[in-house]
């Protein structure tokens, strides 16, 4: 009998099921949480799309507790002081960071530390449109200064500045937002060329973005902007805000409460925009109903020098109030837990913490949430 007529030989290969790569969730939950805690937070929306199990862990309180153990999150606050001289005015910036205590025995205690930010050309001359990405701060040309295309990047881990790739055109007071791993800069230029451009963080290159469909280019001159979903929002005044859709440049206008608010008094947590208004208090924007709603359950002071930002899944509320020390003021912080339900968003306040006493002329310019 030929070999072709012989019956097939049995093999000792294992069944195909045993060749399947082990799942992440075959590991203990604590190990999975520690792995996720080391991933930069800007990738969390992508991970949420991978599986329901990942989405559940990323949206759980446990992930924030684990990140706290690693000291992954921090707030960077920048105050400015202005000194008047006979021939010129000088603006000086003072940086602080709010972070977890390095003492591993107490992972819930916060410390407010002054940090030394090296001088760089133009740094003390004008405020910037800053955007935090992982552990770096990208500085886009600000306002009250000749327009520029230069982008500066501050590495909070090394404590050093570096000059990034320049934009294609000079801008100032532009709308800036981070969407899908790219920085979008809209408006802020007087010419007709390149009304919007986008910076790819991977390739470190600028290219033209979809042309904004707003008829008036002044719609994008702003001093505060945020990102939600695939859109970048410009908060322009006490009456309205505009959105730019990064997919096609489409434009939409929304009303905002007629009240005083601060450039630093806005943030986005879990894809929800929060803004602190002097008269109405802390509010959030309901994108489904397209209206502003109050975060209920809070008793916040009608404070000035407001800064808010995400901090380990909670909202850090920072304000200043008069001090007993002459020509000084106190900087306070209160953490607010947020719980969303069918009826709205309920806030739970934690005890206030005195962060520092600073000179009375300290004015808050930036409040940035960074995550390692």
Swiss-Prot record:
Segments forming a coiled coil: none
UniProt keyword DNA damage present: no
Domain called F-box: residue spans: 21-67
Kelch repeat residue intervals: 136-181, 183-228
Chain ranges passing through the membrane: none
Biased composition (Polar residues): 1-13
Source organism per UniProt: Arabidopsis thaliana (Mouse-ear cress)
The protein's name: F-box/kelch-repeat protein At2g44630
Region (Disordered): 1-21
Ligase found in the keyword field: no
Keywords: Kelch repeat, Repeat
Pfam families registered for this protein in UniProt: F-box, Kelch_FKB95
Gene3D superfamilies for the chain: Kelch-type beta propeller
């Amino acid at each position: 009998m030929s070999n072709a007529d012989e019956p097939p030989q049995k093999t000792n290969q294992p069944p195909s099921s045993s060749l399947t790569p082990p799942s992440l969730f075959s590991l203990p939950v604590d190990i999975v949480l520690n792995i996720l805690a080391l991933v930069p937070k800007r990738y969390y929306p992508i991970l949420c799309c991978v599986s329901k199990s990942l989405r559940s862990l990323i949206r759980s309180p446990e992930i924030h507790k684990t990140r706290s153990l690693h000291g992954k999150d921090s707030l960077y606050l920048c105050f400015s002081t202005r000194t008047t001289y006979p021939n010129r005015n000088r603006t000086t910036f003072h940086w602080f960071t709010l972070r977890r205590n390095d003492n591993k025995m107490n992972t819930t205690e916060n410390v407010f530390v002054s940090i030394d930010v090296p001088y760089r050309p133009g740094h003390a001359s004008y405020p910037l449109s800053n955007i935090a990405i992982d552990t770096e701060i990208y500085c886009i040309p600000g306002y009250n200064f000749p327009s520029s295309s230069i982008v500066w990047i501050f590495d909070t881990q090394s404590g050093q500045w570096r000059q990034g790739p320049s934009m294609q055109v000079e801008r100032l007071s532009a709308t800036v937002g981070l969407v899908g791993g790219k920085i979008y800069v809209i408006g802020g230029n007087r010419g007709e060329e390149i009304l919007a451009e986008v910076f790819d963080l991977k390739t470190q290159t600028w290219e033209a973005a979809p042309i904004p469909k707003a008829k008036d280019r002044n719609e994008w001159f702003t001093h505060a902007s945020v990102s939600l979903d695939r859109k970048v929002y410009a908060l322009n005044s006490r009456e309205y805000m505009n959105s730019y859709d990064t997919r096609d440049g489409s434009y939409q206008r929304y009303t905002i409460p007629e009240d005083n608010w601060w450039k630093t008094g806005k943030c986005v947590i879990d894809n929800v925009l929060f803004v602190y208004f002097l008269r109405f208090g802390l509010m959030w924007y309901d994108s489904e109903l397209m209206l502003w709603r109050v975060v209920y359950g809070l008793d916040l002071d009608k404070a000035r020098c407001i800064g808010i930002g995400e901090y380990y899944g909670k909202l850090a509320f920072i304000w200043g109030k008069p001090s007993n020390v002459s020509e000084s003021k106190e900087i306070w912080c209160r953490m607010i837990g947020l719980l969303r339900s069918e009826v709205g968003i309920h806030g739970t306040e934690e005890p206030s913490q005195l962060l520092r006493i600073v000179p009375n002329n300290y004015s808050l310019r930036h409040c940035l949430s960074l995550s390692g």
